[in-house]
Amino acid sequence: MNALKERKEAFVSGLEGGSIAEINLVTTVALTAYFGWQLLNRRLDSVPLVVDFLLNWAGLLLSITVYANDPVLLNLLIAVPCIVQLQILGRSSQRKTQPQKGKESARLGLDRKPFITAYRGGMLIITCLAILAVDFPVFPRRFAKVETWGTSLMDLGVGSFVFSNGLVAASALLKQEISGQRPPLWSRLVSSVRSAGILLALGVARLVSVKGLEYQEHVTEYGTSWNFFFTLALVPLAMILVDPICTYVPRVFIALLLSVFSEYLLQKEGFLQFMIMSKRDNFFNSNREGILSFLGYCAIFLLGQNTGFYVLGNRPTVNNLYRPSGQSWQQNRRQRLSAWDKWTSVTPLAGLLAWFFITVALFQLTMAYHPYTVSRRFANLPYVLWVAAYNLGFLSMYCMVDSLFNLSQHSNNVPVTLDAVNSNGLFVFLLANCLTGLINMNMNTLDSTLTVQIAALFGYATVIASVAIIMYKCRIFIKL
């Protein structure tokens, strides 16, 4: 048993990752699947659930396993049949969900947008698939988390999870601005502590189970006692301290300051050597990766919040490009607005594209002068900018798909599998972690045949998708 544990730990250690271009191509499968589903949905009364699963779960599973070396072919295999089917079916004489223009609410508020649900659902699915697939040889080692420097699919996944949480968290800030009512500090603190308490409990449970069951662990990922649940729990608590500052300083600047400070520490003489080589003889030394990377994850969360300011509302608000606003730009345009106010009051797509190009430029500039490269282990400045640029870019493309199909912000044209996962995101993520542990404890993942590996992964995906769909159909929503 110990020998197998050591083999499994070695299997995910010392890795160097792959190229950003390949990661983009592989994850584009999620976007292609969403596009294909929308094509079919325009012609069918309803897209069969099996087709939905094959597109959004099986397609992503194949992209990180069997078709990992040829993602372009897989994208074509998904898109072309959907287009052919579209031509065979022809245009339906009656469509059930054509957007009705002119019925937009005159009242400023938040609306559920299909592209955000699809983006978050796809991100959660590929994250859940990867945390088990990484233990099988069919999952390329370049997609697994790197040891220290480099980029990989799984490195992107953890950052995207935090970015997505930040985007959703922006809704509470927007509601406060729109209503003009801000809850007292103690109320926000109690709410954050309650949510953090559940995540901390999950983190402790994972820690105890890993140590008690002698489950394989990758110490340089977060440390000997730290895990991702602790990071998820503490980030919103840290935002309670940051929020008062954000009244005067935009979140984007605070995010950059946190990342620059982290970068300053890493480039101080001797600090990087300490982070990589030091003994793990006390709590700080033992968990130094989790503690230092916390600054970077806070920065990513803040950038996600900033994104929510211009994508969640039902119309552009004044200066929503960089701050939460409850003033509708349409209501204020009759007044004399400054050029700055006009340029920074944007639609979702305009805001996403603006920040995408800014972030890509900052990333390229940083990489040109940075002595090292991206590091998820330390969540350094290049990592923060890479995660932000990726998510902004893919959100832009999801938004373009909605525009192409003329989906209104009130429409519910979202694949059930994506909506189901998105509705119970953290619970699904927890379920995936538990199933991953059970499978690893009862199966030799390293020596399985290709057929057994694919069968196990498809079975795992089917169970998670089924649980999510059943909960969704039964209107069971668990907010952890």
Curated annotation (Swiss-Prot):
This is GPI-anchored wall transfer protein 1. InterPro entries: PIGW/GWT1 (IPR009447). The gene is GWT1. The chain crosses the membrane at residues 20-40, 47-67, 70-90, 114-134, 153-173, 186-208, 228-248, 252-272, 291-311, 343-363, 381-401, 426-446, 450-470. GO terms for molecular function: glucosaminyl-phosphatidylinositol O-acyltransferase activity. Pathway: Glycolipid biosynthesis; glycosylphosphatidylinositol-anchor biosynthesis. It is an enzyme of class 2 (transferase). Belongs to the PIGW family. It comes from Eremothecium gossypii (strain ATCC 10895 / CBS 109.51 / FGSC 9923 / NRRL Y-1056). Glycans are attached at residue 406. It is found in: Endoplasmic reticulum membrane. It is a multi-pass membrane protein. GO terms for biological process: GPI anchor biosynthetic process. Its EC number is 2.3.-.-. Its main location: endoplasmic reticulum. Probable acetyltransferase, which acetylates the inositol ring of phosphatidylinositol during biosynthesis of GPI-anchor. Keywords: Acyltransferase, Endoplasmic reticulum, Glycoprotein, GPI-anchor biosynthesis, Membrane, Transferase, Transmembrane, Transmembrane helix. GO terms for cellular component: endoplasmic reticulum membrane.
